[in-house]
């Protein structure tokens, strides 16, 4: 039975995720698609449970009246049908309603909704641009997804379960008492109005504090994660105390916010406690007055007082439920600000890129990171199919930006990039990047096994292809000697977040093996050998030459000797091409390239 209710909702819908809407309610509703019928059923069972509970109070009052006036000899015979009905209600209906409510809430909605939010939000965020992740902490983004999903679950649960139970329960109480004498309902009605005023005054303030608290929690988490992620830098510069102070400042801001929330909650508790005492006093006073005037039976007086006492405990529970509700709303609002951001790079047409030759055309392109000028201005560059082109320039000249634009990590602000006469903006990002192999200076590795990291370039690769790629990248020898803390060896060893268990050169060789395995028709080498020593560079020279065969290659390097043998060298300065030609032609020209060459020696891609 549990499995049946667990499988009523698919937590992993296959449809492409849409941009979540702005606004807390619309944001939550967006993730409830396919669950709304069960949300309604949850509300109905919660309301039914509350109505039955009040009905039981009414029956107990009636029972008191019967026991005080009816004949013991004929009591069971006279009231048999009512007693049987109430017995069946208590022994059968109440457990069944409670069971259905729990199955819908605990098995169908809460686990599946939490995972559904995480699944859809994660898929949506994976399609965000590189700039989105560069502008925020990875830990902070992850915290928004994890905490936001729990908060959405809490909001939906309290709306459909808690508040449905409360609303139906309060209405049922008023109806029960008013049917006896409307004056018996007055204390509860007044209590309800005053309780609502307390909530109206306090809850918006709680909501604002909760949203601020969620943001400060994310900042605090981001700072802590940032320290852990860059622990080598922290230790290298002996800044442990600096990092603790940096984290402490965010913790203090969070703590101040917590004290604000707890202070407001304390005053709410004081006001509600005073109101509850007033309710019991007023209820007792009204009941005594009605009894003295023979307007209420002992049974209904017992019900009235019992309901007042029930409301006293009920109000404390409700106050904290509402407190949690608004805290969850604040968390949702904070998560929404990150998760609901529109994609900056969008697939306008889901057409695959078809690389037949590998011709690349940069046509009058411009990109300024949102500024008026700078970075790249009106750049034109044609790269023939199979041509090997080296990009040269000082730091900040725009070399890596040019590669990022080719990979469509950013959209052009002007101009056009074509691959085999196909505008890269009109093809899917996945197909574009699947056609380009990249080895960068900053090689990040997933926190998985060495094997998983390498076959990331080609998940369908065989073990033989994997071994061959590692051999060509001069990586097989050190991989076979790896062992992690769990005892995994060789290709099954976990390499750790960002490859912290490997040297820079080892990470670089794994990256080269990964691209060898990918075997894409276009190859980008962005400082691909910067982390390799001269001995290893020389060892993989032949491998890189084989890798470049039959491919269109764009290589970026500060060490000019590594790209001197390229078919053509392009010198970029301040986002514009100022020189291009072969190595010898540029030396003869005596320009920027010649000056840079004079300062450098060595290299692995020889001139012969």
What name fits each language-model region?
Residues 86-98, 192-196, 200, 265-286, ...:
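Hydrophobic alpha-helical segments in the permease module
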């Amino acid at each position: 039975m549990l499995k049946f209710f667990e499988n009523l909702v698919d937590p992993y819908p296959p449809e492409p995720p849409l941009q979540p809407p702005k606004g807390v309610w619309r944001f939550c509703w967006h993730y409830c698609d396919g669950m709304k019928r069960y949300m309604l059923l949850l509300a109905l069972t919660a309301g039914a449970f509350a109505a039955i509970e009040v009905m039981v109070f009414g029956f107990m009052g009636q029972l008191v009246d019967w026991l005080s006036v009816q004949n013991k000899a004929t009591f069971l015979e006279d009231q048999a049908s009512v007693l049987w009905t109430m017995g069946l209600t208590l022994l059968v209906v109440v457990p069944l309603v409670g069971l259905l409510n729990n199955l819908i809430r605990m098995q169908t909605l809460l686990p599946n909704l939490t995972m559904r939010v995480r699944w859809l939000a994660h898929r949506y965020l994976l399609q965000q641009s590189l700039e989105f992740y560069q502008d925020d902490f990875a830990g902070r983004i992850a915290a928004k997804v994890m905490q936001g999903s729990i908060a959405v679950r809490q909001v939906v649960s309290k709306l459909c379960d808690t508040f449905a139970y409360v609303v139906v329960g309060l209405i049922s109480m008023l109806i029960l008492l008013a049917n006896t004498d409307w004056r018996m309902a007055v204390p509860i009605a007044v209590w309800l109005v005053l309780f609502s005023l307390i909530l109206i005054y306090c809850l918006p303030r709680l909501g604002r504090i909760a949203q601020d608290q969620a943001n400060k929690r994310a900042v605090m988490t981001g700072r802590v994660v940032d320290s852990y992620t860059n622990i080598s830098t922290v230790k290298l510069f002996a800044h442990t105390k600096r990092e603790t102070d940096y984290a402490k400042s965010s913790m203090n801001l969070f703590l101040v916010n917590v004290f604000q929330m707890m202070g407001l909650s304390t005053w709410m508790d004081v006001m509600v406690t005073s109101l509850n005492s007033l309710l019991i006093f007023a209820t007792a006073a009204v009941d005594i007055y009605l009894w003295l005037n023979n307007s209420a039976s002992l049974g209904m007086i017992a019900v009235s007082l019992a309901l007042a006492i029930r409301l006293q405990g009920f109000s404390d529970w409700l106050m904290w439920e509402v407190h949690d509700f608004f805290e969850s709303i604040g968390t949702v609002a904070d998560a929404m600000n990150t998760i609901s951001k529109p994609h900056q790079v969008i697939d306008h047409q889901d057409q695959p890129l078809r690389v037949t030759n590998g011709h690349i055309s940069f046509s009058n392109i411009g990109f300024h990171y949102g500024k008026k000028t700078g970075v790249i201005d009106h750049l034109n560059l044609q790269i023939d199919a199979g041509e090997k082109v080296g990009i040269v320039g000082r730091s900040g000249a725009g070399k890596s930006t040019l590669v990022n634009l080719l990979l469509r990590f950013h959209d052009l602000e002007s101009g056009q990039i074509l691959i085999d006469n196909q505008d890269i903006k009109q093809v899917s990002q996945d197909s574009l990047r699947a056609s380009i192999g990249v080895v960068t200076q900053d090689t990040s590795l997933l926190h998985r096994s060495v094997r998983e990291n390498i076959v990331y370039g080609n998940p369908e690769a065989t073990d033989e292809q994997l071994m061959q790629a590692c051999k060509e990248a001069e990586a097989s020898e050190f991989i076979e000697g790896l062992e992690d803390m769990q005892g995994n060896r060789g290709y099954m060893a976990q390499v750790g977040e960002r490859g912290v268990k490997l040297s820079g050169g080892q990470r670089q060789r794994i990256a080269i093996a990964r691209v060898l395995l990918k075997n894409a028709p276009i190859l980008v080498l962005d400082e691909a050998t910067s982390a390799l020593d001269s001995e290893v560079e020389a060892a993989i020279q032949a491998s890189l030459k084989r890798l470049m065969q039959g491919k269109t290659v764009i290589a970026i390097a500060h060490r000019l000797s590594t790209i001197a043998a390229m078919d053509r060298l392009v010198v970029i300065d301040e986002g514009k091409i100022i020189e291009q030609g072969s190595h010898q032609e540029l030396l003869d020209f005596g320009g920027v390239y010649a000056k840079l060459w004079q300062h450098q020696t060595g290299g692995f891609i020889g001139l012969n």
